[in-house]
Every structure is written in structure tokens, then in C-alpha cells.
Regions:
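Active-site region of glycoside hydrolase catalytic domains
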Residues: 1-35, 39, 59, 79, ...
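Chitinase-like catalytic core of GlcNAc-active glycosidases
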Residues: 46-47
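Catalytic domains of carbohydrate-active enzymes, especially glycoside hydrolases
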Residues: 50-71, 252-257
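Glycine-rich, proline-tolerant flexible connector loops at the mouths of alpha/beta enzymes
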Residues: 70-84
Length: 405
């Protein structure tokens, strides 16, 4: 039997662009309309209108927390112009969670940017942290009394990799120099946002909230045990998994470490150049591991290993995303069970874990992969928007009810 603390958080996550629908003022929407992206998000899951029904289902599944994101382009549709209607909408969303006993975990940036911000250079703009801070201040002032957990930036390294290394996400650039600049701007934005949020709560005489980032972490393993591969594994784990965390800790701006974990990355270098060390991977053709529908290896032991790499920082950890896209729901339940077992292994070794948030609550728009990948605990019929709870969700509901697997 695998047991969890009585105060453990159980929940699932969504992000605004992936589920709300109609986010027509963001950079992603413009790229979709221009044909620069293959799939169009459209009405997504209509969560913007149906959020109460979705939260009812989360409560039914014994969740006691829910992670969501605020869509910046809704709050600030034009530079310096803020929408009171949208601030009120998100207030209602947060209160709907509170009414159902779900602790909100609020993410302020989850990949998408306002169109006006993008046209000024996006995160490559020198003033980008200042623009972000202005938006953060408005949101936090509006929601402060009802939010204990804030996530400033979701997966900064994933954003960098897809937008500035591979060039498949907006702004579709391929530049190591730009990537370094954007990384620094995201870090400065997080540090300043942390201090701003903490200051707002102090000014309002509210208890200090828990503030962090959501860091995507991969279990890097060498394909062959060559010196070059081992060195690359070390450097990637350091730069991809840990650098943003360490720099945030050095600035005193992490109250916990938010972890998103999905899979491993098998490293096989083909040369000694910088790009080789950053990007070379094994094609995985000889791997006998089971895979999700996107072809990612299912590697539960990697969760324990990345958590153990965080133990030295002596901060609590919150699993903010862990999930599988699959058309076989029994595979989803197997995935969840094995990752929870791996999680307890790290906890029994001294890693303090606050909670487990599955990705995702409902099927959603999976960025450049469209609507094909099915991550949800809840099935969404994209023709009727009908929700159907999957059996894996009901099994996880028993775990969260009893705090044991």
C-alpha cells in the first residue's frame, strides 16, 4: 500500500488557451489564422462558458485543488488597457472553485501572449518584464484574497525550446542568442513578479502566498554510456531542469518547486558542437518502453529521480502536471498508478511533496498537435462539448478520497 499525507492536494490542471475557446487577441490565434500553425483552437472546450460544470465534475472526483491559468490577452487586450469584465470573469472562476472546496493554483503565463505584446517583440523585448509586471499587478490585486498558490511562468524551458530553438511555436524563431535573451527576461519577470505579489499581499495584511514557477523536468539518460553522452546528460539536466530553479532560489523567489513531469529524454550526441549538446537525442527506435500517443516513453522511475535531484534545495515540491495522452483509458490508469508509486518512493526518501495535479482535467487543444492527443480525466466530444468522466478518473478519485493507493 502507498499512503499520502492527510493534507495532500489532489487535483487536475487546465490552461486558458487550451480549454476556454475564442482567445482571439493572442499571438497563437493570429498564427493559426495566418496558416503558420496547422491546427486552429477555435472554441476549444468552451470552458470559458462551461467552467462551473467542469468544476462540479472535479468536485465529484474528490479533487481538493485545481490548477488553471489566466489569459493575459483577455485581461490586457490592448497595451495599457485593462478589461474589468474579464477581471470579473476570473474572479467568478476563482470563487466557483472556492465554493466547491477546490484550492485554486493560478498560473499567470502559460505560453500565449497578447498580440500587442508580440508585435513589440514579445519576450525578446527589453521591456517585456515590465509589461508582464503591469498585468500581474492587475490580476493579483483583483484575486489576492482568494488565491494562496501562484505560478508566475509555466515551463519556461519548454517555451524557449519550441519558440526559439525548434521555431515551431510563435514567434517561430531559431536563434540561440534570442533564446538566451528570452530566458533572462523570463527569469527577471518571475523574480519581479514574485516580489510584486508578495508585496501586494503584505499591503493588504494577507498571509503570504506560496509563489513558484512550473518547471518541466525530464529524466535525461544516455543512449550509450559514452563520455560524450554522459557529459551531455549532466549539462542538460543542469541547464534544462535546474538552472531556472537555482537562479530563482538565489534571488529568494521560490516558496516551493512546481514540477511538470511526463517522460525521459534519451541523449545520443552526434558531434561536439553546442547544438549537439543542446539538441541531439536518440531516435528511440530500439526502446522497448511503452509510449503515449505522441510517442513519448512512459518512464515512471524518472519522476522519482528528478524529485531526488531537488532534495538538496530543501523546498517543498508540488507536482503541477503529470499525465498521458492515450486512447486506451486502462493505459491512463496504469500510468497514474506507476507514477504515484514513483512519487511515494521520493517522498519516503525525504522529499516533501505538497500534492499531485494530473494533466489534464478535460481533453483539450494540445498546441501544435491539435485536438488529437487525449490527456483528460474527462472526455470531451468536440462536436457537442459533452463531458464524459473516464474510468481512470473514478479510480483516481478513490485514491484522493482515501489518500492511499
Amino acid at each position: 500500500m502507498y499512503e499520502f499525507p492527510q493534507d495532500f492536494f489532489w487535483g487536475a490542471a487546465t490552461s486558458s488557451y487550451q480549454v476556454e475557446g475564442g482567445n482571439s487577441l493572442s499571438d497563437w490565434w493570429e498564427y493559426e489564422l495566418a496558416g503558420k500553425l496547422k491546427y486552429h483552437s477555435g472554441q476549444a472546450c468552451r470552458h470559458y462558458d462551461l467552467y462551473e460544470k467542469d468544476f462540479d465534475l472535479a468536485k465529484e472526483l474528490n479533487h481538493n485543488c485545481h490548477r488553471l491559468s489566466i489569459e493575459w490577452s483577455r485581461i490586457e487586450p490592448e497595451e495599457g488597457v485593462f478589461s474589468n469584465n474579464e477581471l470579473e470573469h476570473y474572479k467568478k472562476v476563482i470563487l466557483a472553485l472556492r465554493k466547491r472546496g477546490l484550492e485554486p493554483i493560478v498560473t499567470l503565463h502559460h505560453f500565449t501572449n497578447p498580440l500587442w505584446f508580440s508585435k513589440l517583440g514579445g519576450w525578446g523585448c527589453r521591456k517585456s518584464p515590465e509589461y508582464f509586471l503591469r498585468y500581474v499587478g492587475k490580476v493579483v490585486e483583483a484575486l489576492a484574497g482568494n488565491v494562496r498558490f501562484w505560478v508566475t511562468i509555466n515551463e519556461p524551458m519548454v517555451y524557449l525550446y519550441h519558440s526559439y530553438f525548434l521555431g515551431v511555436w510563435p514567434p517561430q524563431e531559431k536563434s540561440l542568442i534570442r533564446a538566451k535573451l528570452v530566458n533572462d527576461n523570463l527569469l527577471h519577470a518571475h523574480i519581479k513578479a514574485y516580489r510584486l505579489i508578495a508585496g501586494i499581499y503584505k499591503d493588504k495584511n494577507l498571509a503570504k502566498p506560496m509563489i513558484s514557477i512550473a518547471q518541466n523536468m525530464q529524466a535525461f539518460v544516455p543512449c550509450k554510456p559514452t563520455l560524450r553522452n554522459k557529459l551531455a546528460v549532466y549539462l542538460r539536466a543542469k541547464s534544462y531542469n535546474l538552472e531556472f530553479i537555482e537562479r530563482s532560489i538565489s534571488a529568494g523567489t521560490l516558496d516551493f518547486i512546481g514540477v511538470n513531469y511526463y517522460s525521459r529524454s534519451v541523449v545520443e550526441l552526434k558531434g561536439w558542437g553546442i547544438k549537439n549538446f543542446v539538441m541531439d537525442v536518440c531516435d528511440g527506435s530500439h526502446s522497448n518502453l511503452k509510449k503515449n500517443s505522441l510517442g513519448w516513453d512512459i518512464y515512471p522511475e524518472g519522476l522519482s529521480s528528478v524529485l531526488m535531484s531537488l532534495k538538496k534545495y530543501n523546498l517543498p515540491v508540488f507536482i503541477l502536471e503529470n499525465g498521458i495522452c492515450t486512447d486506451d483509458d486502462s493505459q491512463r490508469w496504469d500510468f497514474i498508478q506507476e507514477h504515484l508509486k514513483s512519487l511515494t518512493q521520493a517522498m519516503n526518501s525525504g522529499v516533501k511533496v505538497l500534492g499531485y495535479v494530473y494533466w489534464s482535467l478535460i481533453d483539450n487543444f494540445e498546441w501544435d498537435k491539435g485536438f488529437g492527443p487525449r490527456f483528460g480525466l474527462i472526455d470531451v466530444d468536440y462536436n457537442t462539448y459533452k463531458r464524459t468522466v473516464r474510468e481512470s478518473a473514478r479510480k483516481l478519485a478513490q485514491v484522493s478520497l482515501n489518500n492511499k493507493l
